[in-house]
Amino acid sequence: MKVIIIGGVAAGASAAARLRRLDENAEIILLERESYISYANCGLPYHLGGVIPERKSLMVMGPSRFKAWFNVDVRTESEAVAIDPEARTVTVAANDRRYTETYDQLLLATGSTPVASDLPGTDPDKVFCFWTIPDMDKVIAKAGSGARKALVAGAGFVGLEVAENLRHRGLEVTLVGSSKQVLPALDAEMGSYLAQELLNTGVRIELGHKVVSFENDGSFRAVLNDGRKLEADFVIMCAGVKPNNELAAAAGLKLGPRGHITVDEKLRTSQPGIFAAGDAVEVLQPVSGRQTAIPLAGPANKQGRIAADNMAGLDSEYHGTLGAMVIKVEKLSAAAVGLTERQLQQLQMPYRKIYTHPGSNASYYPGGAMLHLKLLFAPDGKILGAQAVGAKGADKRIDVIATAMRCGKTAPELAVLELAYAPPFNSAKDPVNFLGMIAENMQKGLCESVYSETLPEGAMLLDVREPEEFELGTIPGAVNIPLGQLRGRLGELDKSRKIAAFCRVGLRGYLASRILKQHGFDCANLSGGILTWEAMNFKPRNTAPVPPPKKPEPAAANSRTLDVRTLACPGPVVRLKKEIDAMTPGEEVRLLAATSFAPDLANWVQSSGNELAGMEMKEEHLEAVVRKKSAPTACSLSASAPAPNSDAAMVLFSNDLDKALAALIIACGMAAAGSKVSIFFTFWGLSVLRKNPAPAVKKTLISRMFGMMLPAGARKLAL
């Protein structure tokens, strides 16, 4: 048997190696138009950033070793330019000559190619793709030639990895994405965690825009569709890929609607003796039951193996691609499997969803990290998709769910999966078990969930967190009754009104909803709590890179140390406040906490007026020094009063009548002293300016909800 394989990377190399193991006597020719075969193209961004220091590490196996190990006739820089299915021949172009090879079986593993930039003003010395080793070499040379600014067009897998690694090289990086989110393989709210991570490292993000042309008048600029011009020393185009289908189309093979090669479960094409595998083929999506294209290395390698089995006479089938994926963005990992909520809506498939934010391991064991999980399932319990983002354990949970999906398990059945447990690795109830338990409660009617984007109109928002947490910020209009006080304060709630209970992550909100339901209230839990609400309302804010806080100085022998690494919310905030309250002004405490506590720490320090004297993000926790604010010093009225004719600004954030009056009195006094005074009314302070009765104004759902939560004008302010 003579087999020709066209394409020598993932699917092609896998097929050649498998075929040789099955048939020692087969004649196998591997044609590759580039200079390299069997290389780690998924590792290219990490060599760009220096994470993989040695270029040769990317070469999984060179042509000579592949020949020695597998006795395969490897022909690099040899391009298949034509196929004759009737004569079973392939025409090859190599070294300025053409020749023809016959075959008994043929495998097309031609892969995919980045969508090329044919935009006006494209300069090949400044606009690059990033797909092959030669592409990578060009970008590394450009980045190392004194370049300071880079622009990455495309916010998918490759775009995110390239942006991150260019930043590691010290370049100023702008990431432009045509979608309103990063990584469309996730839903927008789940991708928001990755966007914020990139912003934290200094990457500038422009979403909902695309590059439409380039200008070069001595300064190279990318022109966006809104007319803005972004200066860059070079641009990397990562705006998607297309299948390399030219050979297949010319040979008369059947193609799908997007140009991918159509294959059956044995990876046979429409022409006898021709198989296809990898990025160029159309595959079954088992969840939707429809054909699609999912260009991932894992499926490509498996398809190459299965195609080889069938060419060798074995009976192997490929049962579709669920699309299990994972990506690293700085300290976070994101993983997903199945369909997204957006895809389910497009397909008009009914679904239910769950958000939860558990820890990666037992809360009492140091080094854990928060996971953001989303599960999508059908009304009958069939798992439709899942997404996970976090510093630890995202891949593990999605792997478990992907396996459950392949085995036909339902969402409630995730609750009974027996998964390995020890405190350094997990909690006794794995986060996947939690998802199953929540799904089971929903299926049995024990838990009604509401969602940030579809809050019932007129619902009361009940924040059941502790007062110290509430002070850090909440959903506008929410009322705070801590969970521990709820049973004793039921009289403050209205049974005629829908209640949406929430906490930070969802657990206490669920407990509150169970209490209230059994006391006759119409109550639901806000799925995912305030963390999911924040993710739903995320908008990237590009600011000048802020230098990281200085590293904490070595602690003095008699200094305080507060270790809250093993405390779940609200423990860290409550313990820190208690510690600070017991300290004298100017005294410092060395704080050890989980890395996920960083945003809450920054908010608490700002709202409390204390000082973050230093902070360092370590591998598995953060270390910070918090200094208690100094006591106010006495001063005379004349010393504290503003100078005449100076400007002053005040922010009114409250809807308390006494605070509003105080702000107005102070402003009038300062104006009488000759100062120019501005008052900014924001959030609840907007109540002072509201007209009553209010004029008819067309508003969005969120705006209407916000309006219902505010007092109806200055006369409705409470003390």
Show the residue positions of the predicted features.
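Mid-to-C-terminal Rossmann-like scaffold of FAD/NAD(P)H-dependent oxidoreductases
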Residues: 1, 280-392, 423-427, 431-459
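Beta1-alpha1 glycine-rich phosphate/pyrophosphate-binding loop at the start
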Residues: 1-73, 115, 163-186, 324, ...
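A Rossmann-like FAD-binding core segment of flavoenzymes
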Residues: 25-27, 75-94, 101, 168-263
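N-terminal glycine-rich dinucleotide-binding loop that anchors FAD/FMN and/or NAD(P) in oxidoreductases
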Residues: 43-75, 188-211, 339, 543-555, ...
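Rossmann-like dinucleotide-binding cores of NAD(P)H-dependent redox enzymes
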Residues: 59, 149-150, 157-213, 294-300, ...
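Glycine-rich dinucleotide-binding loop and its adjacent helix/turn
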Residues: 108-169, 204, 263-265, 479-483, ...
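FAD-site-proximal beta/loop scaffold in flavoenzymes
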Residues: 123-146, 218-221, 228-309, 400, ...
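Rhodanese-like catalytic fold shared by cysteine-dependent sulfurtransferases
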Residues: 412-460, 467-500, 504-567, 575-578, ...
